[in-house]
C-alpha cells in the first residue's frame, strides 16, 4: 500500500500536467471551450501544489474547497461543451474521468499506518526515550542533550516535501517567540546528512539540525513511514523509507507534553499551539 501511495504521489501531478498541456494543444486549433473544462478538472491538483511551492504555505485546508469546486465546474463545462457540439468527445471524458478520480483519491485517501500510529507512538505524559542522532558534522548526539530546558522537535521528511519545508520556515519565523519561552528548536531530518547540511546552509537558521541515520529513532518512536518517499526520488539519493511528519514538545525533565502526528499533510497545527503548550511550562518574560 505504501508503494502504491508513493507511485500515486509521483505520477498523479505529472499526469495532470501532461493532460492540461495536451488539452491546451487541442483547444488552440479546435477553438472550443470544452477543453477548458478538461484543463480545469486536471488543474485541481496543480494549483494547490503551486500554492505550496510558491507561497510556502504549510496547510491548504481540510477539503480544498476551491480546487474541488473548480474540478466539478470543469466537468460541468465539459458536459455542456459536448452537448453543444452533439459530439461525445471520448478523449475529453477520459481526461475528465482521470482527473476526477485522481482528485477524489487525493482528497479521501486513507493510510491505515497513519491512524495506527496514534495508538502505538509516543504520548503526552510519557518520558522521551533516549534517542541517538548525528549532527551535521557527523558527530553522535542524543536527546539527553535536551535535558534542562523545553524542546520542540520537528521530524521532517526532507527538502523534497514542500509542506515540510514550509513548516521548517514557519518555525524559523517563530524562533524568537519559542526561544523567549526557553525552548530549544530541533529539526530532525530523514534525508541524508549532506542534503540536510546544504539545506541548513541555505536557510542559515541557527537551530539544532540533527539527522536520523537509517531512521533508527523513527522506528523506535513508531513514526516510520515505510516506502513513503515518492517513487523516483530514490534515484536522487533519497531513502525509500521516510518519517511521518511529527512534532514533539518536551519539558525540562524530558517528559513529552505535546505530540502531533500528521495523519493528513493538509491539516497541520498552527505554531500558536506550540506557544500555548510552552506557556503552560515556562512563564513568558515580560
Regions found by a protein language model. Name each.
Residues 1-52:
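Membrane-anchoring/interfacial helices and their immediately flanking loops
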Residues 47-69:
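Transmembrane alpha-helical segments that serve as helix-helix packing and pore/cofactor-lining elements
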Residues 66-118:
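Transmembrane alpha-helices and immediately adjacent membrane-cytoplasm interface residues
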Residues 110-143:
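N-terminal "domain-start" segment that seeds a small globular fold
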Residues 142-171:
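Short active-site neighborhood of thiol/selenol oxidoreductases, capturing the structured segment around
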Residues 152-153, 185, 247:
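Hydrophobic beta-strand anchors of alpha/beta hydrolase catalytic cores
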Residues 167-218:
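Structural microenvironment flanking redox-active thiols in thiol-disulfide oxidoreductases
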Amino acid at each position: 500500500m505504501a508503494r502504491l501511495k508513493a507511485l500515486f504521489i509521483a505520477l498523479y501531478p505529472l499526469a495532470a500536467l501532461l493532460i492540461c498541456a495536451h488539452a491546451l494543444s487541442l483547444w488552440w486549433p479546435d477553438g472550443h471551450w470544452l477543453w477548458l473544462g478538461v484543463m480545469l478538472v486536471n488543474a485541481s491538483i496543480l494549483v494547490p501544489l503551486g500554492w505550496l511551492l510558491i507561497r510556502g504555505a504549510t496547510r491548504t485546508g481540510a477539503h480544498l474547497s476551491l480546487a474541488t469546486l473548480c474540478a466539478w465546474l470543469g466537468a460541468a463545462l465539459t458536459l455542456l461543451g459536448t452537448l453543444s457540439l452533439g459530439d461525445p468527445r471520448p478523449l475529453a471524458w477520459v481526461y475528465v474521468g482521470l482527473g476526477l478520480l485522481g482528485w477524489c483519491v487525493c482528497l479521501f485517501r486513507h493510510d491505515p499506518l497513519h491512524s495506527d500510529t496514534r495508538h502505538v507512538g509516543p504520548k503526552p505524559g510519557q518520558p522521551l526515550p533516549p534517542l541517538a542522532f548525528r549532527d551535521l558534522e557527523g558527530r553522535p548526539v542524543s536527546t539527553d542533550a535536551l535535558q534542562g530546558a523545553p524542546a520542540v522537535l520537528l521530524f521532517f521528511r526532507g527538502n523534497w516535501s514542500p509542506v515540510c519545508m514550509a513548516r521548517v520556515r514557519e518555525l524559523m519565523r517563530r524562533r524568537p517567540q519559542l526561544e523567549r519561552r526557553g525552548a530549544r528548536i530541533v529539526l530532525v531530518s530523514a534525508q541524508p546528512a549532506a542534503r540536510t547540511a546544504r539545506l541548513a546552509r541555505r536557510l542559515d537558521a541557527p537551530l539544532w539540525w540533527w539527522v536520523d541515520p537509517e531512521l533508527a529513532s523513527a522506528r523506535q518512536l513508531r513514526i516510520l513511514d515505510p516506502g513513503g518517499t515518492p517513487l523516483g526520488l530514490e534515484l536522487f539519493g533519497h531513502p525509500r523509507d521516510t518519517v511521518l511528519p511529527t512534532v514533539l514538545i518536551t519539558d525540562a525533565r524530558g517528559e513529552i507534553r505535546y505530540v502531533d502526528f500528521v495523519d493528513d499533510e493538509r491539516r497541520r497545527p498552527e505554531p500558536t499551539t506550540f506557544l500555548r503548550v510552552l506557556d503552560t511550562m515556562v512563564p513568558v518574560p515580560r
